[in-house]
Structures are given as structure tokens and as C-alpha cells.
């Protein structure tokens, strides 16, 4: 299936954003480890979170997390530290995504994990047990989800957890998000130095908890505001002092002409008429926003150099290669370096007359390219249903904002 998109001349809309996937998934693991009955409110309705809920509530011996990378990592640690024998698997792409770093770390803590097929990759057979805990050292540039997975089981380890990180730490805001949520549920967990985190063996307390809206989802509406001739967009459920690192996107979009006004119910986006001539930005802390800014800058004719993209190679797809391929269809030649830098210096080629954007089973590819319809009225998005991974209501929300969406020809 493909969607053929058309954009209105001006955007005026009020959008209820989905709940934060990052907070929902962490809260579910922590809540399960607390073994309480209090309610988690406003959980995300995205695929990733629904997979997590199913795994935690049904207790099946074989757990299929489909394409949910967060669930694979968080559940691997959770299942290792709780009694029971399970096999955890996923899609073909999920079985190609490495997990050896996390498995090795869990084995150091005493976990019993076996690879079912290929060494270093899912599926995994896990015999859960009480883990002793110890000091672990990891490179700081590994996926922050590995680090968060280990941290969240820290309070239930017999001796707690001392986690030392070496070198540059990637996605530090996601680590801080995990620590803040752990503290909200009664854990004693904190940085003891710039490179070390201590988690005491102190049980979680179960309590009612409400999940805030998703700043990652908000980024696509900032993008729409930036690309539109006129825009007045209200997004509910977002706050100035957010746990989410992706809230920094508001600061970066301010340089691309989008002003943020905080209201009692959320935020209001308006164009402020000023845009930088070039954007150089480090995305090491906000990698999930990279695709959005690549498309936005190119369409605004703003050359850019984005660094800190090393984690994009092991996401739902190789996002660096995907961006280079799909942006070329729109007439832009991107260059990458060292698997961590992506840039555009203004180089153009002839665009395709009717570009069809491949999404590579990646929700963020679909949502980052859909707003390009504002500049490309013939653009089509292939496999649009992939947005259900994080923002199931995305296409309906675009319709509310005045976008036309038709099923295109294959």
C-alpha cells in the first residue's frame, strides 16, 4: 500500500499527541519489577508498547516482540532477573540486530542466556533467576537501551549494580530519563561521577503514574510548521520541564523558524520568520530526531552537517543509507563519513517526477518524509502502516490538519 499526500496552503490544528513510547516502556518494566497493583495511566497505544504489555501480562513461554527493539532489550534484562524459562524472538530484521553486548553484560551478573540460532543475535533462550549483581564496565557509545535495560533491573539485584561507562556516552538524556523514572518508583540510583552510575539493592515501590505526551512525535509537527507557508499548531500534553531528551528539538527548530509558546495544556507552534543559513548539530543525544531534521533542512535549502549519528546504523534500518537513497529521489545528494556524520552542502540532481519514498519497515522514515508533501505534491509514502510502531494515529492527525491522503497505485 502507498499513500499519495497533498498539503493545505496553511496549517491550523490542535493535536492530541500520543503518550511517550520511551516513558511507557520504561514504566512498564519498572512497574512489573515492583510487583504492585497500582495503575499506569495514559500508556502509549503504539505497537512497541502493546508488545511489551502483552509480554508482561500473558507470560507465554515464547515471546514474539515483532519489530520492537526496545522491547527486545528491556525484556531480555527483565526476563533474566525474574524466575521462568522463556524464548524471546522477533521479525527477520530483529534477528539481524546485534544484542551480544547486553547478553555479555547480563551473563557477568549471573544470567543464563543462550543464542537459539546465530551467536550474538536473537532469538534468545533465557532461564530467569535471582541475579547477584556486580560492577560492570561498558563502552559509553553502545545503545543507551542496553544501559537502561541493565539499570532498571539494578534495584532487584542482590548486591545492586555499579555501572562504569568508558569513552563518549551516547544518548545521555535517555539514560537520565531511565534514572529519573527509577527514582520516581523509589529506587536509589544516581551518577557517582561523569562516567559511573550506582544503583543500590533497594526495591521499587509501586505507585500510580501518568505518562506524558511524546516529544519525538511532536518533532513531525515542528517540521510541518517549518515547511508550511503559514502555521498555527497546538500540541497538547507537552511541558517545558520534560523528562524526555527529545524536547531539545524545540531549541533546534527555533533556528529553523519555528517558535514555541508554552500554554496551560501544552505548546503552540508558530513561524517566527527567521531561519539560519546553515545548521551544524550534534545528534548524539537526540538520534531519533535526525531524519526529521535532514528532510527539513534540505527542503528549506539549509546546508547542514550532522554528527553523532553512529546509532542510526543499527536502528529499524540503516537510517543513514536510507536517508541518502530517499533524499536523492527528491533531488538532494547527501554525504556520510565514518558511519556517524551526514551532511548536505547544497548539491542537487534532477528530482523524480513522482517520488515514492520507501520506508524500510521504519516508522520514522514514513513520518519524516510525509511533511515533504508541502513541497512535493506528487510524493507517495510506501508501506505507510509502519507508523503504528510509535504513532498509530499519525495519518488521522494529518487529515485533521488538512492534508489529503489517498491510496496510491502500486
Swiss-Prot record:
GO biological process, one term: chorismate biosynthetic process
Entry annotated with the keyword Cytoplasm: yes
EC number of this enzyme: 2.5.1.19
InterPro entries found in the cross-reference section: Enolpyruvate_Tfrase_dom, Enolpyruvate_Tfrase_sf, EPSP_synthase, EPSP_synthase_CS, RNA3'P_cycl/enolpyr_Trfase_a/b
Keywords carried by this UniProt record: Amino-acid biosynthesis, Aromatic amino acid biosynthesis, Cytoplasm, Transferase
Pathway given in the UniProt record: Metabolic intermediate biosynthesis; chorismate biosynthesis; chorismate from D-erythrose 4-phosphate and phosphoenolpyruvate: step 6/7
GO CC terms in record: cytoplasm
Catalytic activity: 3-phosphoshikimate + phosphoenolpyruvate = 5-O-(1-carboxyvinyl)-3-phosphoshikimate + phosphate
Keyword Cell membrane among UniProt keywords: no
CDD domains: EPSP_synthase
Residues annotated as the enzyme's active site: 288
Location(s), subcellular: Cytoplasm
Main location: cytoplasm
Binding-site residues, 3-phosphoshikimate: 21-22, 26, 143-145, 171, 288, 315
Positions annotated to bind phosphoenolpyruvate: 21, 69, 97, 145, 319, 364, 389
An example Gene Ontology molecular-function term: 3-phosphoshikimate 1-carboxyvinyltransferase activity
Any Pfam family: EPSP_synthase
Family classification: Belongs to the EPSP synthase family.
Stated role: Catalyzes the transfer of the enolpyruvyl moiety of phosphoenolpyruvate (PEP) to the 5-hydroxyl of shikimate-3-phosphate (S3P) to produce enolpyruvyl shikimate-3-phosphate and inorganic phosphate.
Description of how the protein assembles with itself and partners: Monomer.
Protein name: 3-phosphoshikimate 1-carboxyvinyltransferase
Organism expressing this protein natively: Bacteroides fragilis (strain YCH46)
Name of the encoding gene: aroA
Amino acid at each position: 500500500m502507498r499513500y499519495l499526500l497533498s498539503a493545505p496552503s496553511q496549517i491550523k490544528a490542535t493535536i492530541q499527541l500520543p503518550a511517550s513510547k520511551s516513558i511507557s516502556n520504561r514504566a512498564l518494566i519498572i512497574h512489573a519489577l515492583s510487583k504492585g497493583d497500582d495503575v499506569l495511566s495514559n500508556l502509549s497505544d503504539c505497537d512497541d508498547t502493546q508488545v511489551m504489555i502483552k509480554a508482561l501480562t500473558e507470560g507465554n513461554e515464547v515471546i514474539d516482540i515483532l519489530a520492537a527493539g526496545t522491547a527486545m532489550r528491556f525484556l531480555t534484562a527483565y526476563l533474566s532477573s525474574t524466575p521462568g524459562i522463556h524464548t524471546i524472538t522477533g521479525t527477520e530484521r530483529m534477528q539481524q540486530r546485534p544484542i551480544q553486548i547486553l547478553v555479555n553484560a547480563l551473563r557477568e551478573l549471573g544470567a543464563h542466556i543462550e543464542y537459539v540460532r546465530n551467536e550474538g543475535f536473537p532469538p534468545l533462550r533465557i532461564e530467569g533467576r535471582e541475579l547477584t549483581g556486580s560492577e560492570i564496565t561498558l563502552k559509553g557509545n553502545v545503545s543507551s537501551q542496553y544501559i537502561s535495560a541493565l539499570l532498571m533491573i539494578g534495584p532487584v539485584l542482590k548486591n545492586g549494580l555499579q555501572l562504569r561507562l568508558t569513552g563518549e556516552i551516547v544518548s545521555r538524556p535517555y539514560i537520565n530519563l531511565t534514572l529519573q523514572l527509577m527514582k520516581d518508583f523509589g529506587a536509589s540510583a544516581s551518577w557517582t561521577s561523569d562516567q559511573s552510575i550506582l544503583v543500590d539493592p533497594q526495591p521499587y515501590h509501586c505507585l500510580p503514574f501518568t505518562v506524558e505526551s511524546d516529544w519525538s512525535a511532536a518533532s513531525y509537527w515542528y517540521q510541518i510548521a517549518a515547511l508550511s507557508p503559514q502555521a498555527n499548531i497546538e500540541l497538547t500534553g507537552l511541558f517545558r520541564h520534560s523528562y524526555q531528551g527529545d524536547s531539545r528539538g524545540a531549541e533546534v527548530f527555533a533556528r529553523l523558524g519555528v517558535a514555541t509558546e508554552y500554554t496551560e495544556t501544552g505548546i503552540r507552534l508558530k513561524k517566527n520568520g527567521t531561519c539560519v543559513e546553515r545548521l551544524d548539530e550534534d545528534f548524539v543525544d537526540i538520534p531519533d530526531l535526525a531524519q526529521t531534521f535532514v528532510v527539513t533542512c534540505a527542503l528549506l535549502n539549509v546546508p547542514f552537517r550532522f554528527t553523532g549519528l553512529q546509532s542510526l546504523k543499527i536502528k529499524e534500518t540503516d537510517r543513514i543509507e536510507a536517508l541518502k537513497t530517499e533524499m536523492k529521489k527528491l533531488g538532494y545528494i547527501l554525504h556520510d563519513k565514518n558511519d556517524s556524520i551526514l551532511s548536505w552542502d547544497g548539491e542537487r540532481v534532477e528530482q523524480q517526477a513522482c517520488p515514492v519514498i520507501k520506508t524500510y519497515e521504519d516508522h520514522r522514515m514514513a513520518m519524516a518524509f510525509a511533511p515533504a508533501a508541502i513541497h512535493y505534491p506528487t510524493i507517495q509514502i510506501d508501506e505507510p502502516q509502519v507508523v503504528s510502531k510509535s504513532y498509530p494515529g499519525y495519518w488521522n492527525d494529518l487529515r485533521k490538519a488538512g492534508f489529503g491522503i489517498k491510496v496510491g497505485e502500486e
